[in-house]
Amino acid sequence: MARLRRAKRTSYRRRRRTTRTRTVVTRTARSTVRRRGGRIVYRTSKTTRVGTRRMRGGFLPLLAPILAAAIGSIPGIVIAAKQK
């Protein structure tokens, strides 16, 4: 007799499968604990990188405050030039 398989119910939007990462700071070294399936994988690194963020958005966001200050100072320069 053939056994019928029930159709698996899936939600409308499928969830992306990601691995959970948890950072554990110990006295000796910083280790990253990754859960993959049922296993736990330990990764340790000798050098701890703190505060090294990569600049996102390219070069323009870095120039934005400088450009804003330059544009804001134009009226003051014009007024000072007219007074002479």
Curated annotation (Swiss-Prot):
Keyword DNA-binding: yes
Any Pfam family the entry gives: Adeno_PX
Keyword DNA-binding attributed: yes
Propeptide: 1-38, 59-84
Domain of life, source organism: Viruses
Molecular function terms from GO: DNA binding
Disulfide bonds: none
GO cellular component, one term: viral nucleocapsid
Record site feature (Cleavage), residues: G38, R39, G58, F59
InterPro entries: Adenovirus_late_L2_mu_core
Subcellular location: Virion
Annotated stretches, region: Disordered: 1-35
Residue ranges, compositional bias (Basic residues): 1-20
Keyword annotations from UniProtKB, A to Z: DNA-binding, Late protein, Virion
Compositional bias ranges of the Low complexity kind: 21-31
Family per similarity comment: Belongs to the adenoviridae pX family.
Functional note: The role of the precursor might be to condense the viral prochromatin for encapsidation by virtue of the two basic domains.
Protein name: Late L2 mu core protein
Species per Swiss-Prot/TrEMBL record: Snake adenovirus serotype 1 (SnAdV-1)
Lineage: Viruses, Varidnaviria, Bamfordvirae, Preplasmiviricota, Tectiliviricetes
